[in-house]
From Swiss-Prot:
Function: Catalyzes the oxidation of either pyridoxine 5'-phosphate (PNP) or pyridoxamine 5'-phosphate (PMP) into pyridoxal 5'-phosphate (PLP).
Name of the protein in its database record: Pyridoxine/pyridoxamine 5'-phosphate oxidase
Organism from which the protein derives: Mycolicibacterium paratuberculosis (strain ATCC BAA-968 / K-10) (Mycobacterium paratuberculosis)
Gene that encodes the chain: pdxH
Cited SUPFAM superfamilies: FMN-binding split barrel
GO molecular function: FMN binding; pyridoxamine phosphate oxidase activity
NCBIfam families per UniProt: pdxH (TIGR00558), PRK05679.1 (NF004231)
UniProt: substrate binding residues: R13, V14, E15, Y16, K77, Y134, R138, S142, R203, L204, H205
Cofactor(s) named in the record: FMN
Length: 220
């Protein structure tokens, strides 16, 4: 039951409506004339220009093997009409979830801009070539970190983690190129449904949903 300590939380409120004050247009179905990919790319670019930290960050929701929801933040690294791609350790908890239930949802939350995008659909692993192409663009430190971490597995201390990093750093010291770890790669989320959300006054937000070729406005 909510108590006195929750009153501060209950008073927390953001009044949306900056789109009215600065003269920007309302989100509407015609914003999707060029497709959902074009608008999502634009909103990511808008977030970057606005100084949003990690504008391509998205909250990934999965279902655990025992049927419980789980979420975490990952980064969108590719985007086209087939869907969106992120990369991770194939032995991680999220990978276990996706092996059991190959379906996921993501949310791009740009709170500073009063915008969100929700996307959901079936998930599949990308090809080894797609993984290789992205891996080659990662900083060497990130590559070594992927080798050092047995993602989602317990470890005694941070010192132990840094020792694992030191070991792989020494292992690949004479290698010009760090190879892709055998248990690392990408996932593609095919977009069954995409929803664009824009905050508005009095909680009468703009919601536009794309399902296949159908684009429609939803009540908030």
């Amino acid at each position: 039951m909510p108590g006195p300590a929750d009153e501060h939380l209950q008073r927390m409120r953001v009044e949306y409506g900056s789109v009215e004050k600065d003269g920007s247009p309302d989100l509407d179905v015609d914003w999707l004339d060029d497709g959902w990919v074009a608008l999502l790319r634009k909103w990511i670019d808008d977030a970057e220009r606005a100084g949003v930290a990690e504008p391509n960050a998205m909250v990934l929701a999965t279902v655990t093997p025992d049927g419980r929801p789980a979420s975490r933040t990952v980064l969108c690294k590719s985007l086209d009409e087939t869907g969106i791609t992120f990369f991770t350790n194939y032995d991680s908890a999220k990978a276990d979830d996706l092996a059991a239930t190959p379906y996921a949802a993501v949310t791009f939350p740009w709170y500073q801009l009063g915008r969100q995008v929700h996307l959901r659909g079936p998930v599949s692993k990308v090809t080894a070539q797609v993984t290789e192409d992205y891996w080659s663009k990662r900083p060497r430190g990130s590559q070594l970190g992927a080798w050092a971490s047995q993602q989602s597995r317990p470890i005694a201390s941070r010192a132990a983690l840094l020792e694992q990093l030191a070991q792989v750093t020494a292992r690949f010291a004479d290698h010009e190129r760090v190879p892709v770890p055998p248990g690392w790669g990408g996932y593609l989320i095919a977009a069954d449904v995409v929803e664009f959300w824009q905050g508005r006054e009095n909680r009468l937000h703009n919601r536009i949903r794309v399902t296949g070729d159908r684009v429609e406005r939803l009540q908030p």
